[in-house]
Amino acid sequence: MNIQTDVRKRLKIPKDYIFYPAMYLPHKNHKTIIDALKILKNENRNFKLVFCGNDIGYASNLKKYSKKLNLNDEILFLNFINDEDLPYLYLDASILVMTSLIGPTNIPPWEAFKMKKPVIYSDLPGIREVLGDAVHYVSPMNSVDVAKAIKKIFDDQDYKNKLIEKGFEKFKESENNDNFSKFFKIVKDFKKYQKTWIL
């Protein structure tokens, strides 16, 4: 069993999901993504969503809310993921969606850039100066806007590829940043073996 298969089995993750790695806190704004998923489901667009992060008690509220919207089967709530497993969650994800109400110091966009995954990100003051045109910006409290962004990236392959290309270029510009060196070393190590995998 290869490492990726082991991670999938151990964490029970699906493939091709929407991914948001962040602590379960109100200002991380998981709710907007949950609401967007409900909008998509009502349009017969079925997506899987994976959350992961440290929890100090707020995750239970999100789980109850997801159940209320009948999204139990669509959303997987994971706890904190260690640095060794995290790259593999990016590998199976289709898109990173971050609706945090605070930024722009978050690391996940850079992880997604390295892994060549498209990014949807909150349009907050200071974000554009950091991430430029490498992400699709959304109003973080507008679930309709987030749902439209998700559909745009899944339905428009050229646009998706453009975001991936610009994101990777942005990553290359910051490749020597020490803040990301540990994660990127893990990525480099498993990439050596990835080409031998049968997924």
What residue spans do the PLM features occupy?
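Glycosyltransferase donor-sugar binding loop
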Residues: 48-63, 79
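Conserved acidic donor-binding segment of nucleotide-sugar-dependent glycosyltransferases
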Residues: 136-143, 152-157
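A charged, aromatic-enriched C-terminal amphipathic alpha-helix characteristic of glycosyltransferases
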Residues: 158-194
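A structural motif in glycosyltransferase catalytic domains
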Residues: 18, 33-37, 49, 112, ...
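Nucleotide-activated donor-binding/catalytic signature segment of Leloir-type glycosyltransferases, i.e.
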Residues: 62-84
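Conserved donor-binding/catalytic core segment of Leloir-type glycosyltransferases
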Residues: 12-28, 34-37
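Short acidic alpha-helix that forms the nucleotide-activated donor recognition element
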Residues: 82-93, 114, 128
